[in-house]
Structure formats: structure tokens, C-alpha cells
Amino acid sequence: MNMIHRFMGCIREYKKPTILTLLCMVGEVAIEVLIPFFTANLVNEIKGGAELSGVVRVGLGLILMSLVSLGCGALGGLYGSRASAGFAKNVRHDVFTRVQSFAFENIDKFSSASLVTRMTTDINNVQMSFMMCIRIAVRAPLMFLFAVIMAYIMGGALATTFLIIIPVLVIGLLLIARKAMPAFRAVFRKYDKLNESVEENVRAMRVVKGFAREGYEKQKFAAASHDIAKDFTFAERVVALNAPLMQFCVYFNLIFVLFVGSRIIITNGGTTIDVGQLSAMLTYGMQILMSLMMISMIYVMMTMSYESFVRICEVLEEEPALTDPASPAMDVKDGSIDFENVSFKYSAQAKKFALQDINLHIDSGMTVGILGGTGSSKSTLVQLIPRLYDVSEGCVKVGGRDVREYDLEALRGAVSVVLQKNVLFSGTIKDNLRWGNENATDDEMIEACRLAQADEFVRSFPDGYDTYIEQGGSNVSGGQKQRLCIARALLKKPKILILDDSTSAVDTRTDALFREGFRTYIPETTKIIIAQRVASVQDADLILVMDNGHIADMGTHDQLLASSEIYREVYESQTNGGEQDEA
């Protein structure tokens, strides 16, 4: 019931076409059920030698009723299409909005391919089910009910024969659903895997071609596609049993009614039931069985779509891990940062902390460098500052206030993060830069690009700042992408700027120009630089050496050379390596 209530809420502004669809279906069914009644009278009048004018009058009435029924059906289809399209639009909007509210912790529960499948294939299935529900799911039960009532009015006990076959039909449908539902559930899960494989392949196409792995990727895709085809074929084979089951029920019932009705007419000479009534009974029998067939179609469709409903509900019912407090602080005073007894793990069930016992104070305007090996939790540390995750123990403060006390948008507006994986979106360079500040002027964008050492190469493009960036920034180099991402971050004019290994694709000269520009033009901004090169952070006011989730050492470059074995080893290996390269 909770699932039904949730999806009914997605009708919203499309209540009117939904209600009109239902009313049209009621009108169509009511007229369709009355037509056999008048047809029976027409047959009896013709058999009894009625005047032609009477026959014509009844015939014209039947034609008019048929046209009205046809009109109701057409309008029902029109309103139903509008309602189902609007319903799907609202479901898609609600799912996308919910995903946008997720923290990294929530997103970690779903793969990106799974979310794409849920917002496309699953919502399309739900839309089809909704369309069937407001049309056929109303039409079929009403037709069954009205036809049974009219059959009893016209045929009395003979109408009971229509109900004999229903238990057979119900048992058959339940057996079909019992087999089909698990099969469709498996199909949708494998769709996630297939989409994940496609997404991964497209994104890494250069790597695939660089290693000549096209054959392997084809085999992997073919195997995933074959698994889906196999499971889907099994599910469809089970569902296909519905059609012969229904045909058996329809033909058996019609033959049985025709046999019993004919015997009654022959035996009683038409005193109990006449030819017109028998013809009407056969029509009502068809309507009853057709309504049951439609109900079985709905049942099969809902069996196929149930897993889609469940998967969409999983997203809609996922509570965002991070929420704003009741009375959030809206202003970040400065760029000072404090870590007080901070420990963190990515899930409550994890046995090991990713960060443990972190205590650190950073004054506003400082430049802080972070070094450490792979897996030392450098990125994890800085992701706690804009509250991409919540700490497990202790607290992180920005501007002297716990980050959990801020409005999330206000906090993240004061913190610019350039992540390891640089992302550009389809659109012009200007469009991408305005992600940092949608109201930025051309002069502000140029200034940010100059500071990020991007202005020169942008101007080298024929269209300059209006150059179109392909999806994922595939038409610019890695270093150019990094510089554009840094410029975008600078446009926010943040109080804290975090560069998470964001200069790895640029040369040492450009890296040095970054640092000089930051010192000169944004001295009030707190700058945190994660790097692999000691040269990138050696001028920092404070350098942290991370090791296995702990701050192993901290100090200036000279202090760490004297006191930190880890730092000294890294520095000497890079210095000696550079000397050997030059030699």
C-alpha cells in the first residue's frame, strides 16, 4: 500500500486527464454492454416479422451507440496518453531530484549504471503499467461486472456457466506469475550489469584501443547480452502460456454456452430463452471472457513491471545521509579549519576506520600541502571539509563552527574542490566555467583562467571561450582539463580551495605558476593541495604526511626533512630521480 500511495502522488497536476480517462472508460464499457441487449431485441423483431421502420430505428440507434462508444474509447486513449506521459515525467523528476539530494554515502549504494537503468528502462515500464491501469484495469473489471449482470438479466441460470471456468484461469495465472516474477527480477539486475559494462567501455574507449582489447570487450558484452536474452526468453516463455490458457477458456465457454443454450431452445421451444437472448448471451460471454483476458494481460504486465516499481521505490525511499540542521548557519566567517579527534569510516558496518584520531588546526589563508602513499586517506581527509561525508567520531569545523551546523549549500559555496577525476560537461568553455559562478562576467572568467594558466590555450582555439567541449572533455588534453577545472573552482571566490591531486597532468613550470599566482592573488583563501610531487607543496606553510589513515608527521618542508623519515625518502627519491633524468 505504501508503494501505491507513493506512486499515486506522482499523478499531481495530471489528475484531470486521469479522471477523464476513467470516465471515458466507464462510458465506453456501459455502452458496449448495452449494445448486445438491443441487438437481441433487433434479432427477435426481425424473426417475428417486425416492420422495416422499427428495424431501421433500432439499427440507427445501435450505430449511434457504437459511435459514442468509439468516441469514448478514442478520448480515453488521448487523455490516458497525456496522463501516463505526465505521470512518468513526475516519477522521473522525483527520482532525479532524490538522487541529487544524495550524499556520497547514498550514491555508494547504487552503481551509476543502475541509477541510469532505473531512470530510463524502469520508468518506461512503470509508465506502460500506469497506462494499462487507468484504461484496461478500469475497463476490464467494469466490463466483467456489467456483462455478468446483463447475462443474468437475459439468461438467468445459463449465465452461471460463464463462471465455471474462472477458477481454472485464476490458478493458471498464479502459477505463471510465480515462475515469471523471479525471472524478470533477474533480467533487470542483469540490465544493470550490461549498462555498467557499456558505460565503462565508452568512457575508457581510448584505453581499450590502446591495449587492443576490443575483442575481449566484445566477448564480455556478448556474454552479458546472452545472459539477459536467456533469462528474458525464459520469462517470456512462461508469460506466453497466458495466451493459450485464455483461448482455451474463451472457446470452451462459448461452445459450452452454445450447446446448453441450443438444447434449452430445442427442448422448451423458445419459451425459456429465445434466439435473440442466446445471441446476446454469446456476446456477453465474449465480453466476460475478453475482460478476463484483459485482466490477465494486466496481471502479466504488472508481474513484469513489479520489479521496476520496487527498484524505483528503493531510490525514492533512500533517505539522504546528510541533511541541513533545523536552524542552519548561512555564513562561513573565514577559511579556518579544525579537525578535533576525528575518526571516519565509510559505513557503520566497516571494521576499519579510514581516518583515525585526526587533530589539526589550519589558520585562514594558509597553504597546506598533503603527501602520502596510495590508500593513505588523503582524499578522504579533505572530503570531510565540505561535508561530502559526515565524520564517525569527533568534529570538523570551518570558520570556527561545526560543518554540521551549516546549510549545506552555504558551506559548499565557501569551499571549492577540484577532485582527482576532472569532469567537464557538454557545452562551451564559458558554460563549464559558469558552473563555478553562473553570474560570472567575461572579465571574471578570463581572470580565473589566467590564474589557472588556462587563458593562453583557450585563446588558441578558433572559437576561444565559445569553444564547444565534448562530453567528458574528450576534445581537450588532461592538463587543459585540469586547468579549466581549477579556473571553474576559482570563479566561486571560495574561502577554502582544495586541489585533490589536480595538477598531476601539468608540467612543473605550470605547477610553479599556479603556486605563485595563488600566493599573489588569493592570499586570504585557505589552500589545501594534495600532491604526489614534493615540489608542488614544498613552499606550503604546513605539510601533512599521511600514512594509513593517520597524520604521520606535519611541519614545514625544512622541518620534515629533518624529522620525518617518510618525507625525506620521498623527497630524496624524487630529487635523485630528477637528477638522473637530467643526466
Which ranges hold each PLM region?
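ABC-type nucleotide-binding domain
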Residues: 331-583
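Transmembrane helix-loop-helix hairpins at lipid-water interfaces of multipass membrane proteins
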Residues: 12, 18-75, 79, 152-157, ...
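Hydrophobic alpha-helical transmembrane segments of ABC transporter permease domains
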Residues: 23, 27, 31-35, 60, ...
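Helix-loop-helix
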Residues: 51, 55, 146, 150-164, ...
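An intracellular "coupling" helix at the cytosolic face of ABC transporter transmembrane type-1 domains
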Residues: 13-16, 101-105, 121-134, 138, ...
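Juxtamembrane helix-loop junctions of ABC transporter transmembrane domains
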Residues: 23-24, 31-44, 65-112, 116, ...
